Amino acid sequence: AGASPRPQGDPESVDQALGLLARAERPIVVSGSGIFWSDAAAELQAFVEQAGIPLYTTPQGRGAIPEDHHLCFLTSRSEAFRETDLIFLVGTRLNYIIGYGRAPRFSAEARMIQVDIDAAEIGRTRSVDVGIVGDAKSVLGQFNKAAAGRLRQSRYAEWVNHLAEIDSQKAPAREKAMSTDQIPIHPLRLCKEIRDFLDRDAILVVDGQEILNFGRV
């Protein structure tokens, strides 16, 4: 027997979600490990590039899109979560890793679109404006087809520039920590040395606690 077809999202819900995105001014996409399980990295990248929406990932979702991509802003994460007016959540649960999607981690006023293959996860820890049950690869494919002509990158340009400016303001302190010769070694210097040594497509396994936080930068 062949593989089971990937479940798609309700077309009306996809259309409703696109309407919210078209009216938003400060949207973000938050993705997680479900992107890998669904083999949806290409669809995710196509979506954020077509729409021009900034992307943030959970620790388990890192690497789906290169983190030096022009729509990824590693050090403006907290500001983006607090200032966003629309959260597009795909491939991740609203669990403790992202503060259950609630304030103060996220803006309490932000609208939310949640895509999950498990219907029980929709709105489990925070109310959502549009919930879409389906496979991440399939649903993102639906968005990519339906978004043509409906989402304009220029609408979010000011928001993207704002997040990029926050990143730029934090860069000097980050670079200073990465180049210091202090003993014991600064965690960011350690991360830089490892990064420079590894190939770009290397797989890195990071444990928890502080090294996870520094490695995120």
Show where each model-derived region lies:
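Active-site diphosphate/adenylate-binding microenvironment
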Residues: 164-217
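Proline-rich low-complexity regions
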Residues: 1, 27, 54, 172-175, ...
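Phosphate-binding glycine-rich loops and adjacent basic patches that engage nucleotide phosphates
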Residues: 4-11, 43-50, 98-109, 148-160, ...
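Cofactor-/ligand-binding subdomain signature composed of acidic, glycine-rich
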Residues: 1-25, 142-152, 157-172
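Generic structural signal for well-ordered, non-membrane alpha-helical segments
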Residues: 7-10, 14, 33, 37-44, ...
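Conserved short-loop catalytic and cofactor-binding motifs
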Residues: 2-5, 32, 127, 178-182
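Anionic-ligand anchoring segments at beta-strand to alpha-helix junctions in alpha/beta enzyme folds, i.e.
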Residues: 7-10, 16-87, 196-217
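Glycine-rich, acidic loop regions that bind phosphate or pyrophosphate groups
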Residues: 57-162
